[in-house]
Amino acid sequence: MGDYRYTCEGSHMKAPIGARVSIRFHDPEGGFRDLVGYLESENSLRNRHGELIEFDVEKIAIYKVIEEKIHSAGHGAPLSIRIQELERILTATWPPLRQEFFGKWLIRTSGKFTMRANSVLPSGKAPYGEPSQDIDSSIAHVITHYEKEGLAPIFAIPLPTYADLDSKLFEQGWIEKVRAHVMVADIAEHVFGQSKFKTLISDNFDESWLALQEDHGVAELMRGYPALYASVFDGEKLIGVGRTAHAEGWSALSRVFVDPQYRGQGVSKLIVNALLQSSLEAGIKKSVLQVDSKNLTAINLYTSLGFDFHHEYVYRSYQKTLQILSEGCC
């Protein structure tokens, strides 16, 4: 539960995107109706079931911003609930071009760029989540959907919640493509030491930012949600980049990349610290990121910055070949 910190009347909400709100609307037939959830835009919110609901701001009678009770990152609720919360945040801050619910499974479609934006995220009760049909029919529906899109069918399976689903897909021949750690941290003040490199934070990116790691393919996805972008320079040369986006009180880090010639010089740490400090200044107290489970160098870096392992997920593909850009999460 949260605390109601202030109440406002009228149709012009000042609540920030990502805030949890309770909104009361005038009902055309008389009386009122209420919605509670996290704001995703000026006229939409996502409720506790993960459903996106649009509303008419002109019909708002009153609204309240609910300030959540603060728990340490990765604590405060059963693991299965925390996993679903974090996966919801990671989807919100890296939104697919199209998404639709199949029961409580979320089917995400975005062309050929990134597995997260082109995969099914199960949700609901274990062992398989809660699709709208029996499990075998639901898997067949997923295959049909992505094959019609010209894409490899992929599941993004949070573990251990849906370990039985992972096993079932494995038995049916689905191939493991990537296994990733989800790591979390409480954000603390960051004291920046002397550095010969210059760090800038912006609310947008430019051609040079995209070009550093050939990120042109994900530009449209990144524009789909407000974010902060870090750039590190050696003189006039761009040598490192990173991104964070805020949702539900979390800072979701992604796209951290350093020019190979500058690796081992603390540039990654500069990027992450700058993004976390900017998040803290925006009132964000917790951070989450994804990293390939095989990337021990990055895992050690994030551990040194206070991140702890929370859970892992696996991408399983129905085909042995996959024409989708790999998830670049760190």
Model-derived segments and spans:
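Conserved active-site alpha-helix within GNAT-family acetyltransferase domains
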Residues: 160-176, 269, 293-312
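Conserved beta-strand-loop-alpha-helix junction that forms the acyl-donor binding cleft
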Residues: 156-163, 260, 289-299, 315-322
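A conserved beta-strand-loop-helix scaffold within acyl/acetyltransferase catalytic domains
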Residues: 219-260
